[in-house]
From Swiss-Prot:
Its cofactor is FMNH2. This is Chorismate synthase. Reduced FMN (FMNH(2)). One of its GO terms (cellular component) is cytosol. GO terms for molecular function: chorismate synthase activity; FMN binding.
Length: 369
């Protein structure tokens, strides 16, 4: 099985399965000399881990990270960093009823057709459990970006099903299990999820991620554009079915006189481009939005087929998130951070000595809309 590595200079290769003994990743290309402890990584993993509220899977995994290599006396050495997270709360018996059938909406059918074998326990390699090591790697990327460039990567839930969540303040995000930027709407979200769980159904979500402080110049046109790599990484998150950069699909209805972000000596007047022009960062906030589909594992009976091609009815009894989007915010943040650190290192390698006589304008002009 290929396709397990993300990045060019800063690479992350994940390993493991949902119900195996452990999951983890190997990070290659991390710059030496950065202070790093397991506690730095654990902070991010705790934001993603399961069992944190009644609205997510009740699988109780501590997600305690172990750093096996690449750090000596609390400092990165430049050698590969191996992160290990042991699985402790597998309940494989919950999946016995799907050993011979395919769950609608899951990777069961495609994995079987492609590889001729599949680990049906919790989805095996295709499980969202594998986003834990991604978040671990993202914690390292975030730390380096923050300390080296002052870059901050933050995200929030902007919609749960048909409920739009107006942005109020970043401080609200860390105060509720939905990562909602509006505390007043949390009771409505809780009632919505309680009703959904009673129905045995699931729902999708939209997550917005913003990277602030990114310098101008990151990105490698034509085929390694910064926004292309962001979209590639975001689509690597389980259940993501759509990615927008900046205005995204709303650009279709905008006129050029509106969409084109004007430049003034005082800065950019708008940011419909989402901080990327020609595949290269502009110095503005990089804004990304992802659409997450409803969880495929639901208690509602669904039609399917067996491995022999016979008709079957599938009802899933495992412990699942009724909305995987609830825990997706730190995952999306990590993916964006991993792309940014990779492009930061690539830019430094090729263009670190380049200078321009044209002044770099502010990310936002005083009269910006």
């Amino acid at each position: 099985m290929s396709g397990n590595t993300l990045g060019t200079l800063f690479t992350v290769t994940t390993f493991g399965e949902s119900h195996g003994p452990a999951i983890g990743c190997v990070i290659d290309g991390c710059p030496p000399g950065m202070a790093l402890t397991e506690a730095d990584v654990q902070l991010e993993l705790d934001r993603r881990k399961p069992g944190t509220s009644r609205h997510v899977t009740q699988r109780q995994e501590p997600d305690q990270v172990e750093i096996l290599s690449g750090v000596f006396e609390g400092v990165t050495t430049g050698a590969p960093i191996a992160l290990l997270i042991r699985n402790t709360d597998q309940r494989s018996k919950d999946y016995g009823n799907i050993a011979e059938t395919f769950r609608p909406g899951h990777a069961d059918y495609t994995y079987w057709q492609k590889y001729g074998v599949r680990d049906y326990r919790g989805g095996g390699r295709s499980s969202a459990r594998l986003t834990a090591p991604v978040v671990g790697a993202g914690a390292i990327a975030k730390k380096w970006l923050r300390e080296r460039f002052g870059v901050e990567v933050r995200g929030y839930m902007s919609a749960l099903g048909e409920i739009e969540i107006p942005f109020v303040d970043w401080s609200h995000v860390r105060e509720n299990p939905f990562f909602a930027p509006n505390a007043d709407i949390v009771p409505q979200l809780e009632g919505y999820m309680d009703a959904l769980r009673k129905d045995g159904d699931s729902i999708g979500a939209r997550i917005d991620v913003v990277a602030s402080g990114v310098p101008v110049g990151w990105g490698e046109p034509l085929f390694d554009r910064l926004d292309a790599d962001i979209a590639h990484a975001m689509m690597g998150i389980n259940a993501v079915k759509g990615v927008e950069i900046g205005a995204g699909f709303a650009s279709v209805a905008q006129r050029g006189s509106v969409h084109g972000d004007e430049l003034t000596p005082d800065g950019f007047v708008g940011n419909h481009a989402g901080g990327v022009l020609g595949g290269i960062s502009t110095g503005q906030d990089i804004t990304v939005s992802i659409a997450i589909k409803p969880t495929s594992s639901i208690r509602t009976p669904r039609r399917s087929i067996t491995r022999a091609g016979e008709p079957a009815v599938v009802e899933t009894f495992g412990r699942h998130d009724p909305c995987v989007g609830i825990r997706a915010t730190p995952i999306a943040e990590s993916m964006l951070a991993l792309v940014l650190i990779d492009h930061a290192l690539r830019h430094r390698a090729q263009c670190g000595d380049v200078s321009s006589a044209t002044p770099r304008i502010a990310a936002r002009a005083p009269d910006a809309q």
